[in-house]
């Protein structure tokens, strides 16, 4: 066939009628047909994504917070911040085709700041439960950068994949909660010349997966080695929530506030009149950097929510009100044995008082309840007692419960 007679095998246009004509074994395709084929494939992919997204009904921020309210007592501001951040995160994913090219919506990873036992992990867990997305928890203190003894950051993603039943597409829209994130702060503000195995190096390793990358995950876990096969997962749509107590950061915030409010018109409250939460609500990225988080890592967590220490009243509500309240759980378990158990108001207050003494927030409630209920759940079904009331006496003597004491209190 002469050059003049060469035609596109698909549309029949001659070489002169098109910009390019690509030759294959016995066939030719023009640039316009290549573009058309590309557009068809793109459209089909887009339709598949839209079908996938239609299955996921994105709840509004109010609905998300209402669900959180059923499990998490208090923390109103944190729940509101988290609800909006999560809504925007998934809206960014599922409405991607409607976002104009000149706008780029940043990923809204979340940093939760608050003392131990105030509900940081529970908030993240409850969100994943409500949205029906895969969820994984990691402890930042067990992570090390590549080449050191410890856990690779990619193992976090392996847990997420496992919890998604090895469905990579589902895992790519999951939620990862990284606890104790403050424990990997570097030891000083200045970048260290020597290696910081548990601090800056881990932040750098996490940074890659948090900001969005194609990560290579070893399917068996453990360390990577050159001869194993990897699972590839795109992390750009995974929501990362990090939590930590950041003990001492309030001093950094106070120092900055005191300096910036010196002079005419200063309206800062005296230190003794400001609560820890009031101080922490003024946290800015520079405070986190001074604490020891690297600027790039701080920049990848644009949403910051501060959780308040739990008051006695809040602990009392946590004990009795949520769907998963400990009192409700133990009542349900004993009712299966035909035992009706009740707690006096004074007994509940005693449990809270004992939990406060442990200084571990809501975790203290579980510790006290487990100590109290161990012998009750062991003895009551065996004694044939059908109705029992827990009193403060029993709470304070929970490690000395005997059959005689139970019979006496039941009688």
Curated annotation (Swiss-Prot):
NCBIfam families xref list: clpX, PRK05342.1
Top-level taxon: Bacteria
Protein residues bound to ATP: 115-122
Key words of the record: ATP-binding, Chaperone, Metal-binding, Nucleotide-binding, Zinc
Keyword Zinc assigned: yes
Annotated protein name in UniProt: ATP-dependent Clp protease ATP-binding subunit ClpX
Record keyword Zinc present: yes
Organism: Dictyoglomus turgidum (strain DSM 6724 / Z-1310)
SMART domains reported for this sequence: AAA (SM00382), ClpB_D2-small (SM01086), zf-C4_ClpX (SM00994)
Family: Belongs to the ClpX chaperone family.
GO molecular function: ATP binding; ATP hydrolysis activity; ATP-dependent protein folding chaperone; protein dimerization activity; unfolded protein binding; zinc ion binding
Residues covered by the ClpX-type ZB domain: 1-49
A Pfam family recorded for this sequence: ClpB_D2-small
Oligomer and partners: Component of the ClpX-ClpP complex. Forms a hexameric ring that, in the presence of ATP, binds to fourteen ClpP subunits assembled into a disk-like structure with a central cavity, resembling the structure of eukaryotic proteasomes.
Gene3D superfamilies referenced in this protein's UniProt entry, alphabetically: 1.10.8.60, ClpX chaperone, C4-type zinc finger domain (6.20.220.10), P-loop containing nucleotide triphosphate hydrolases (3.40.50.300)
One GO biological process term: proteolysis involved in protein catabolic process
InterPro entries according to UniProt: AAA+_ATPase, ATP-dep_Clp_protease_ClpX, ATPase_AAA_core, Clp_ATPase_C, Clp_protease_ATP-bd_su_ClpX, ClpX_bact, P-loop_NTPase, Znf_CppX_C4
Residues the entry annotates as binding Zn(2+): 8, 11, 30, 33
GO cellular component assignments: HslUV protease complex
CDD domains to which the protein is assigned, alphabetical: RecA-like_ClpX
């Amino acid at each position: 066939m002469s050059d003049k007679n060469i035609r596109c095998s698909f549309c029949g246009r001659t070489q002169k009628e098109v910009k390019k004509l690509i030759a294959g074994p016995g066939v030719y395709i023009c640039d316009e047909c290549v573009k058309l084929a590309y557009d068809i494939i793109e459209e089909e992919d887009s339709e598949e994504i839209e079908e996938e997204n239609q299955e996921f009904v994105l709840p509004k921020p109010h609905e998300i917070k209402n669900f959180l309210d059923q499990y998490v007592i208090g923390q109103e501001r944190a729940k509101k911040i988290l609800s909006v951040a999560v809504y925007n995160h998934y809206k960014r994913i599922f409405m991607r085709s409607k976002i104009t090219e000149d706008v780029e919506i940043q990923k809204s990873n979340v940093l939760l700041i608050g003392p131990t036992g105030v509900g940081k992990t529970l908030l993240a867990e409850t969100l994943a439960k409500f949205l029906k997305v895969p969820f994984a928890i990691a402890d930042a203190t067990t992570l090390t950068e590549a080449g050191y003894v410890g856990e690779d950051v990619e193992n976090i993603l392996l847990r997420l994949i496992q919890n998604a039943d090895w469905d990579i597409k589902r895992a790519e829209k999951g939620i990862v909660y990284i606890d104790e994130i403050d424990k990997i702060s570097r030891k000083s503000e200045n970048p260290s010349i020597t290696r910081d195995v548990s601090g800056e190096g881990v932040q750098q390793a996490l940074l890659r997966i948090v900001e969005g990358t194609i990560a290579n995950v070893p399917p068996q876990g453990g360390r990577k080695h050159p001869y194993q096969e990897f699972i590839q997962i795109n992390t750009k749509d995974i929501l990362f929530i990090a939590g930590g107590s950041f003990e001492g950061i309030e001093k950094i915030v106070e120092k900055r506030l005191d300096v910036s409010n010196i002079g005419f018109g200063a309206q800062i409250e005296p230190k003794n009149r400001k609560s820890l939460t009031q101080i922490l609500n003024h946290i800015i990225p520079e405070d986190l950097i001074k604490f020891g988080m690297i600027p790039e890592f701080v920049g990848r967590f644009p949403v910051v929510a501060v959780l308040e220490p739990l008051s006695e009243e809040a602990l009392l509500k946590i004990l009795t009100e949520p769907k998963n309240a400990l009192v409700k759980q133990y009542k349900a378990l004993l009712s299966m044995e035909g035992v009706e158990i009740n707690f006096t108001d004074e007994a509940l207050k005693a449990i809270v008082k004992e939990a406060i003494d442990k200084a571990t927030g809501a975790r203290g409630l579980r510790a006290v309840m487990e100590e109290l209920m161990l012998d009750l759940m062991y003895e009551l079904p065996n004694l044939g007692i059908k109705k029992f009331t827990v009193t403060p006496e029993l709470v304070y003597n929970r490690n000395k419960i005997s059959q005689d004491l139970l019979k006496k209190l039941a009688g």
